[in-house]
A protein has these predicted regions:
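Acidic, proline/glycine-enriched N-terminal capping motif
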Residues: 2-142
Length: 142
């Protein structure tokens, strides 16, 4: 699973009607909480999370500076919207895949931390697209 140039059909950075920029991260976002594995010493991420992170690391890295530049226009804590496009119709909790995305946003320097002093997460209604799952990330004005 590699989300490279074959995702060129969708512009990763898009402007919506309100003028806010949106960033597209392809791939069905797994829960970093569910499915953790015990090694005997500590927990490690599930295979699904490890596969997702390997497939999306270049995309997160590519948009780091652009996201940080946009973030400078907002006061902390910033309201960030997550719109999940699910690849299956399985039930899910918004918070679990959002935690995966927020962890990656911290890892790649999009945000300093994902605690309440830095981010107020918001959610749009999820949609379903078996061929093109992913998540839209948008910085909202307060």
């Amino acid at each position: 699973m590699n989300y490279g140039k074959e995702w060129a059909w969708m512009d990763n950075l898009e402007n919506n009607n309100m003028g806010n920029k949106k960033w597209w991260i392809p791939g069905n976002v797994p829960s970093s909480k569910n499915g953790r594995r015990w090694t005997g010493k500590y927990f490690i991420a599930s295979k699904a999370v490890m596969t997702y992170r390997k497939a999306t690391k270049d995309i997160y890295a590519e948009y780091t500076e652009e996201f940080k530049k946009e973030l400078e226009n907002h006061e902390l804590p910033v309201k960030i919207s997550f719109e999940f496009v699910r690849g299956s119709r399985h039930k899910f909790d918004y918070l679990n895949p959002a935690q995966t995305v927020q962890d990656d946003m911290v890892k790649y320097g999009w945000i300093e931390d994902d605690n309440a002093e830095f981010i107020i997460p918001a959610f749009e209604q999820y949609t379903y697209n078996k061929e093109n799952p992913g998540v839209w990330i948008e910085i909202l004005s307060k």
